[in-house]
Amino acid sequence: NIILQDKTGIMDGKIWDPNSLGIDDFDALDYIDVVGDVTSFAGAMQLNIKRVRKAAEDEYDPADYLPVSENSTDDMYSQLKAFIGSVENTYLSALLKKLFIEDEEFIKAFEGHSAAKTVHHGFIGGLMEHTLGVTRLCDYMSKAYPVINRDLLITASLLHDIGKTKELSSFPLNDYTDEGQLLGHIYIGAQMISDLAGQI
């Protein structure tokens, strides 16, 4: 018994003879290519699987299987870099660049994470979309109230949820990690910033 899922819903799948030709090994949460017949059992649709194999990375688009931001990741990342480029304070700029420009592992995690499990922006790209929304509001407020330190406010808005890259697991799970359960994203993010600041 397996459960098949895409962004439209789930369906039960049955592999009646796991040792037959055409049934390749795969693990839970793998993207798989299946061939089979759809039947109805107890009022529900199920797929009797004849062939299955693990799909190669270039054979699928996660957007077809998981909730994804309607905004382009590349466009959002360009907007994020523009905000970073607008920060004039040398140290704050260096801090942002070290994380959002130089740290490829972090960038990949940030682009692919949600902002929450279910409450808001619970989809791939949700963390970046949420962060940009907060940063736009802060940018507006800094123009409306010139007494505000814009560089500090923009930096804080860009960094405020970075701990969520460690608090939540990546998709398709999008669930709390042990570290996330024990520490929470605010503490995790503060520690990440402290570690980065120590390198500047």
For each of these PLM feature ranges, what is it?
Residues 1, 9-12, 18-64:
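OB-fold single-stranded nucleic acid-binding module
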Residues 2-6, 170:
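Short, acidic/hydrophobic/Gly-rich beta-strand patch recurrent on exposed beta strands
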Residues 7, 35, 69, 124, ...:
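Metal-centered catalytic cores of metalloenzymes
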Residues 46-112:
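Extended, charge-rich, solvent-exposed interface segments
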Residues 62-68, 121-124, 177-181:
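A ubiquitous short alpha-helical element
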Residues 93-137, 159-163:
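A short mid-domain helix/strand-loop element embedded in enzyme catalytic domains
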Residues 118-120, 129-130, 140-200:
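Divalent metal-dependent catalytic cores for phosphoryl transfer on phosphate-bearing substrates
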